[in-house]
Regions:
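Amphipathic alpha-helical "coupling" segments that flank catalytic cores
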Residues: 1-237
Length: 237
């Protein structure tokens, strides 16, 4: 499906579908089938969204954060809950270098992965980060935290925008530095033929975050503050 957005209000209210065959009814049957599939998916999304919102309003995001203990980050690196603890500490340590409030950066890092435990993101993984920003807004968290939920994965590629909000930058740097150091420790390094954990992208993300925001960060110190046992000299060579 190709979404069509109304330029006046920004809403997606149409879609385009493509078929490689002609039909006697000028595609009416194909269109009806696609409408049925799309309606079912959107109905599922609405159901999961409403369930998530009820849970967030009743319990906040703490239940999701704790349930990340059951979500594996990597079988040699523990759970997403353990990773969240590392990100919170590292974000707080990095914050002064990027002009962010350390306590706010730490709080943001504690919730940016919470939506991984939500029903909607479980069914629609591409929405991770975006849904975290919505849920944190519902919880009444600081707006900078909501922005960080959506932006901490960025930049995802050369054409992706780099976050500029200080808290977002702190958490985004921590996310990428933790990924680099942790996978280096277990000797899962990229090669000329493969990079299954997108470590090159993470490294380029660190560089872009610093250069495009005109920031300076002692990387040796950042690596040593990250995953236990990381060899900062090996990472920088």
């Amino acid at each position: 499906f190709f979404s069509v957005r109304d330029p006046k209000n920004g809403r997606i209210d149409r879609f385009i579908t493509v078929a490689n065959q002609e039909t006697k009814d000028d595609g009416a049957t194909i269109l009806a089938g696609n409408k049925k599939v799309l309606f079912a998916r959107l109905s599922d999304a609405k159901f999961f969204w409403e369930n998530d919102v009820r849970m967030v309003r009743a319990e906040g995001m703490a239940l999701w954060i704790n349930s990340l203990a059951k979500v594996t980050f990597h079988n040699k690196l523990g759970s997403e809950r353990e990773r969240v603890e590392r990100l919170a500490k590292l974000s707080k340590d990095i914050a002064p270098y990027v002009h962010a409030d350390p306590e706010l950066a730490e709080q943001a890092a504690m919730v940016v992965k919470a939506d991984l435990a939500s029903q909607l993101v479980y069914e629609f993984p591409d929405l991770q980060g975006l849904m975290g920003s919505y849920y944190s807004n519902i919880c009444g968290l600081n707006p900078e935290i909501s922005v960080a939920c959506q932006e901490h994965y960025a930049p995802l590629g050369p054409s992706d925008k780099v976050p500029t909000a200080p808290v977002s930058v702190a958490v985004a740097l921590a996310e990428k530095i933790d990924k680099l150091t942790s996978f280096w420790v277990i000797d899962e390094k990229p090669t000329g033929r493969k990079d299954p954990f997108a470590l090159r992208r993470a490294a380029l993300g660190v560089v872009r975050l610093l250069l495009e925001n005109e920031l300076r960060l002692p990387l040796r110190d950042a690596f040593s503050m990250s995953y236990p046992g990381a060899d900062q000299d090996n990472l920088l060579n």
